[in-house]
């Protein structure tokens, strides 16, 4: 069973992280980013933020580089907004589930077209 506190902290971090990325990050590489989820370990020491980026592969890499550069600032801001003894160490990862879902949807659409043509 998942640690309820870790889940609650993850949801709060997702909300605050989204706000920080929209309002406080001035890096032009960090644009069109959506935070889709945050997984926090049970001991609240590490957190992985899952993001999606609108754009091609080059823009995704540039965005990830910008987020890695701003990681210290983001962690400091999270520490100010969320009352924890220690702010979790952040890492960023791309959320592939949306692309996977779109691919499945297009495959199903193609199957339906083929069935209707036959």
UniProtKB/Swiss-Prot annotation:
It holds the Pfam family RBFA. It is found in: Cytoplasm. Keywords: Cytoplasm, Ribosome biogenesis. GO terms for biological process: maturation of SSU-rRNA. GO terms for cellular component: cytosol. SUPFAM superfamilies: Ribosome-binding factor A, RbfA. GO terms for molecular function: ribosomal small subunit binding. PROSITE patterns: RBFA. Gene3D superfamilies: 3.30.300.20. InterPro entries: KH_dom-like_a/b, RbfA, RbfA_dom_sf, Ribosome-bd_factorA_CS. One of several proteins that assist in the late maturation steps of the functional core of the 30S ribosomal subunit. Associates with free 30S ribosomal subunits (but not with 30S subunits that are part of 70S ribosomes or polysomes). Required for efficient processing of 16S rRNA. May interact with the 5'-terminal helix region of 16S rRNA. Belongs to the RbfA family. Monomer. Binds 30S ribosomal subunits, but not 50S ribosomal subunits or 70S ribosomes. This is Ribosome-binding factor A. It comes from Shouchella clausii (strain KSM-K16).
């Amino acid at each position: 069973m998942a640690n309820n506190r870790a889940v609650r902290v993850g949801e709060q971090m997702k909300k605050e992280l989204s706000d920080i990325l929209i309002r406080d990050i001035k890096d032009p590489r960090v644009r069109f980013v959506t935070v889709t989820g945050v997984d926090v370990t049970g001991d609240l020491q590490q957190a992985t933020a899952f993001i999606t980026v609108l754009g091609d592969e080059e823009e995704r890499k540039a965005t990830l580089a910008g987020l890695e550069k701003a990681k210290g600032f983001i962690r400091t801001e999270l520490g100010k907004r969320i009352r924890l003894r220690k702010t979790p160490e952040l890492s960023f990862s791309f959320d592939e589930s949306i692309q996977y879902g779109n691919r499945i949807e297009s495959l199903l659409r193609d199957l339906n077209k083929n069935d209707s043509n036959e």
